[in-house]
Amino acid sequence: MKFSTVILAAGKGTRMHSNMPKVLHTLAGKPMVKHVIDTCNNLGAQNIHLVYGHGGDQMQQALVNESVNWVLQAQQLGTGHAVDQASPHFQDDEKILVLYGDVPLISEDTIESLLEAQPTDGIALLTVVLEDPTGYGRIVRKRGPVVAIVEQKDASEEQKLIKEVNTGVLVATGRDLKRWLAGLNNNNAQGEYYLTDVIAAAHDEGRAVEAVHPSHSIEVEGVNDRIQLARLERAFQARQAKKLLEQGVMLRDPARFDLRGTLQCGSDVEIDVNVIIEGNVSIGNNVVIGAGSILKDCEIDDNTVIRPYSVIEGATVGENCTVGPFTRLRPGAELRDDAHVGNFVEMKNARLGEGSKANHLTYLGDAEIGKGVNVGAGVITCNYDGANKHKTVIGDDVFVGSDCQLVAPVTIGNGATIGAGTTLTKNVAEGELVITRAPERKIAGWQRPAKKK
């Protein structure tokens, strides 16, 4: 179904109390307006006309990778005026869908229903019935069909009793919408050009107006303050959690789970409370994610356990691994099958080989570590000389004792042993033992100082 979209995103968002344009505030880790853009792209919109005003530079910087037609609304003179700024780009025979950058949860199904419902040469309008319609434009019907929309400030007392309200979302043909927009005036209580007045214009021409309801009213709730944004955040997260539960993922507490990207899960995955998923995350079968962990743009293979409060970003974790608690895997970290990293271990751009372990208080950066290696507590790969990064290479079956500093570039051969407390600056051959310690001294007759009375 061919259509183009106008997204209204020019509002300042005064009640957000922020210097950032309202539509750039995030929901599930993504700007609200980006949710709307993604929905349109998923449905195959031919053109997306983004009407902006306040914070234009911020908007264009935040959405630099989006394929949209930027339309400036220099003065905010109402929704009708905003859509009219984009009207020179409308093709006469295409459907024009009007959406809002601060209404991020509208679904693809609802939009498809609206597009399909548009009468020939008429308008399809998205409406919703609210128990408390205060503040919304009322849908005025005459013996069934919609004949007009009356804004709250312009409504009579009788009209204020109407509970069916306008969401602002509509579809019309480009040719008709351009004509109706050109005929708008601002003779109303707010002195603005209302988009809603095109409904009356269509009715006056004898055009049909078809009302469609969303699957759930939360889809058409807008955001004007942080309270409303928080409400939509929880609604969105609840919806995502429900889908995961239906797919067989065990969320220990769905209300304490945040998905801020995409998650692909195998079978029998268990996710404990307060876990945050960001970016694109893939989890295999029989994986356990401990409480308070953060996973971003990473892959975790089958039968792996991520213990509580681990942070994994841009990393790959193999099968049968154990990570954490309190582990940080940074971009480029890779754990091969059966590897273990424990509490307060940090890895970046480093590979830990099959069956290797670094269980305590360790930094592994720019390192290649082979199979069956034991990395003791307090080991540091000294990879940075103040100007450049250097690599540490450790072969298979190496034992690195506690509190060692491996000053890169350095290579340790297979089966070597590095004694505790060693500062290593030279390569080590296969099977060698290397120890660099200060001589141990025993001071005869020494006594502790006595405390002053």
Curated annotation (Swiss-Prot):
Q: Which reaction does it catalyse?
A: alpha-D-glucosamine 1-phosphate + acetyl-CoA = N-acetyl-alpha-D-glucosamine 1-phosphate + CoA + H(+); N-acetyl-alpha-D-glucosamine 1-phosphate + UTP + H(+) = UDP-N-acetyl-alpha-D-glucosamine + diphosphate
Keywords, A to Z, come to: Acyltransferase, Cell shape, Cell wall biogenesis/degradation, Cytoplasm, Magnesium, Metal-binding, Multifunctional enzyme, Nucleotidyltransferase, Peptidoglycan synthesis, Repeat, Transferase
Q: What GO terms are given for molecular function?
A: glucosamine-1-phosphate N-acetyltransferase activity; magnesium ion binding; UDP-N-acetylglucosamine diphosphorylase activity
Annotated metabolic or biological route of this protein: Nucleotide-sugar biosynthesis; UDP-N-acetyl-alpha-D-glucosamine biosynthesis; N-acetyl-alpha-D-glucosamine 1-phosphate from alpha-D-glucosamine 6-phosphate (route II): step 2/2; Nucleotide-sugar biosynthesis; UDP-N-acetyl-alpha-D-glucosamine biosynthesis; UDP-N-acetyl-alpha-D-glucosamine from N-acetyl-alpha-D-glucosamine 1-phosphate: step 1/1; Bacterial outer membrane biogenesis; LPS lipid A biosynthesis
**Which parts of the sequence bind UDP-N-acetyl-alpha-D-glucosamine?**
8-11, 22, 73, 78-79, 100-102, 137, 151, 166, 224, 330, 348, 363, 374
Principal localization? cytoplasm
Q: Name one GO cellular component term.
A: membrane
Name of the protein in its database record: Bifunctional protein GlmU
Lineage, highest ranks first:
Bacteria, Pseudomonadati, Pseudomonadota, Gammaproteobacteria, Vibrionales
